[in-house]
Amino acid sequence: MAQGNIKVMGAQNNQVVEQYMTQAKAFVYAACEDFGIALVEAQACGTPVIAYGGGGALETVIDIRQDQDQGTGIFFFPQTHQALAETVETFSRFQHQIRPESCRNQAAKFTPKVFETSYLAFLEQCYQDFTKTVR
């Protein structure tokens, strides 16, 4: 099934996942989810992402072809194995432009603390808007 450069490992603890993720050339994600925490976790390890360009990936990954300075990965379209294979080839031409620190900086935008701060600011704004209409 898997070739010599692919290792199917099954469930692993966080330490093993982090070790492999940090050493990976890229994290491939072909699913379409609303958020997809695995994309953020890969970037937190400094690992570029090759992802289907739909769903939450569009918010969490920056395509290197769109932003040469802050790119954190590359998208493929449509969601087919042919498009994925072509994008893996394309990634090989761009991979050295993607900096681990850019990946980590992008992941830092999705920490629980950032979410909490944003959510509280949103609630405060809603409250302020509400109190203006009540008076």
Per-region residue spans from a language model:
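Conserved acidic donor-binding segment of nucleotide-sugar-dependent glycosyltransferases
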Residues: D63-H81, T90-H96
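Nucleotide-activated donor-binding/catalytic signature segment of Leloir-type glycosyltransferases, i.e.
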Residues: M1-Q15
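A charged, aromatic-enriched C-terminal amphipathic alpha-helix characteristic of glycosyltransferases
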Residues: Q79, H96-K132
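Short alpha-helical donor nucleotide-sugar binding micro-motif in glycosyltransferases
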Residues: Q19-A24, Y119
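Acidic donor-binding loop of glycosyltransferase active sites
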Residues: T22-D34, T47
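Short glycine/acidic-rich beta->alpha loop that forms part of the nucleotide-sugar donor binding site
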Residues: D34-I37, Q43, G53
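Short alpha-helical segment that forms part of, or immediately flanks, the ligand-binding pocket
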Residues: E18, V40-A44, L58-E59
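Short hydrophobic beta-strand element within catalytic cores of glycosyltransferases
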Residues: P48-A51, L58-V61
